[in-house]
UniProtKB/Swiss-Prot annotation:
Belongs to the terpene cyclase/mutase family. It is found in: Cell membrane. The keyword Cell membrane applies. Its main location: membrane. The keyword Lyase applies. GO terms for biological process: triterpenoid biosynthetic process. Keywords: Cell membrane, Isomerase, Lyase, Membrane, Repeat. The active site is at D392. PFTB repeats lie at residues 69-110, 418-459, 486-526, 534-584. It catalyses: squalene = hop-22(29)-ene; squalene + H2O = hopan-22-ol. It comes from the Bacteria. CDD domains: SQCY_1 (cd02892). This is Squalene--hopene cyclase.
Amino acid sequence: MTVSTSSAFHHSPLSDDVEPIIQKATRALLEKQHQDGHWVFELEADATIPAEYILLKHYLGEPQDLEIEAKIGRYLRRIQGEHGGWSLFYGGDLDLSATVKAYFALKMIGDSPDAPHMLRARNEILARGGAMRANVFTRIQLALFGAMSWEHVPQMPVELMLMPEWFPVHINKMAYWARTVLVPLLVLQALKPVARNRRGILVDELFVPDVLPTLQESGDPIWRRFFSALDKVLHKVEPYWPKNMRAKAIHSCVHFVTERLNGEDGLGAIYPAIANSVMMYDALGYPENHPERAIARRAVEKLMVLDGTEDQGDKEVYCQPCLSPIWDTALVAHAMLEVGGDEAEKSAISALSWLKPQQILDVKGDWAWRRPDLRPGGWAFQYRNDYYPDVDDTAVVTMAMDRAAKLSDLRDDFEESKARAMEWTIGMQSDNGGWGAFDANNSYTYLNNIPFADHGALLDPPTVDVSARCVSMMAQAGISITDPKMKAAVDYLLKEQEEDGSWFGRWGVNYIYGTWSALCALNVAALPHDHLAIQKAVAWLKTIQNEDGGWGENCDSYALDYSGYEPMDSTASQTAWALLGLMAVGEANSEAVTKGINWLAQNQDEEGLWKEDYYSGGGFPRVFYLRYHGYSKYFPLWALARYRNLKKANQPIVHYGM
């Protein structure tokens, strides 16, 4: 299936023709590099996080910052959809939970419920059954404000913290993000505090009489019924937990949070966990100036885009879900190494020199529950997140260091960092041959059936994209496909290929991202390019190319009623992924690649980069998507530089893992 989005493409550009485009993009990116060598770009989610930020401030009863609230309000109103509500991604369908939170936040800062934009949103909420039909986290937010009874929130007793590790529901069996969000939330559920809410704003008008929350529809019906029955029992016995047991469990939660507080980068370095930690300390009576509460509160502010947004300058403000400096810096370093030349390579070396001391060498994080004898050696995604290094980031940084080390006399500079990273990453391989992002063997699938997990994102099982990056890292470092760990990993990738030839992408949207990742890995692992799996993937990428020469994929491709790839207008990031995937397996001279390169050439903006409103980053399928503002800047440059290099070499072979 193809989508026509612009006029016909030009004839094939020669490498000399793309050189000015490459140089213009390179200069633009170099201008965005920080003096210490790193890059970081805005990371935007949906209306939920900015709305929650407003609600957090009013929950805590903090003085209103009218200027900031006005700018967040402007942001929320701008991204309201034509359907009357708020979506999880640009151009998406109305999401009930995001709409409830955005409406509540706007009302909190003074928007009249009778204003046209509020009336449209309210009508859409009521048409869908009202706020009672929102997801679990939204209902928790409403319960914290006294806008809903806690009986409508699935019960997660704080005593869960005292359960032995063999117990079926244990925090160590959950993904890092679920763990860090849940632990402070357990305290809130136990104490049931009520927001200060000094303006007394509620949203009674969003409820439909006699409507109750809907039961989870996905998952295993037997497990669903079991956990649903258990939830009813837990609600009934909740008032009768022994007080000393409850106090011990709360103490365990506080210890967990405080141990992982992570300075001004916050618990887990993600907004929901950080906000919950602030509310936990508040509910326990910690004053505002208490060191732990104060530093957690400052961590929230670190996520704010206050100095002008890329889209609207200083007219708007929003809160990011987290920060992405390690990821952005490593990927730009790859792009600069591909561009080559003294200036670009110097910037890449500067970036890698910034990354080197960020490596986590001394802290055994939560991952050690499954790998107690493994030495740490990974990188996080954020500025700091020592308990939660990211396998994907680690593999990407390691490959960039390996490539840079081949330049002149730099081998010794990164050798020790690479060795520790390789040791840790390989040690994190799961039993099925693949890798998860933060834990090994985190595949307790029955947990996604508990009522609390209506988001379906409680786990961190092995995924194709992360596993492909690990294969790429190992192969680029010279590990042969005959190595047992490498063979298991390649077998995992081949087994996970979809019938149409694509691969699922967990952390990027979606099948284009997964297929790019897998093709890069299989190429550097020395699978022949005429291998059936590679040929099927190449054919699939060519089949879904848009008529304008680019590629695009909608976030709806993650729908539960799986039908595969969902076409969309071409985007710079997804076009670059498709091109990098095709070029990795010998397709640099194909018509499809020529068309794609032309699309990038034609869509470069005056600054030298590319604009992209669409979301191409994956947070949690069907629940949370990300717009990486850097993706449309460095991935196209990377693809163009690789195209030029392959054309100049007149030998279309890619020797690197990405």
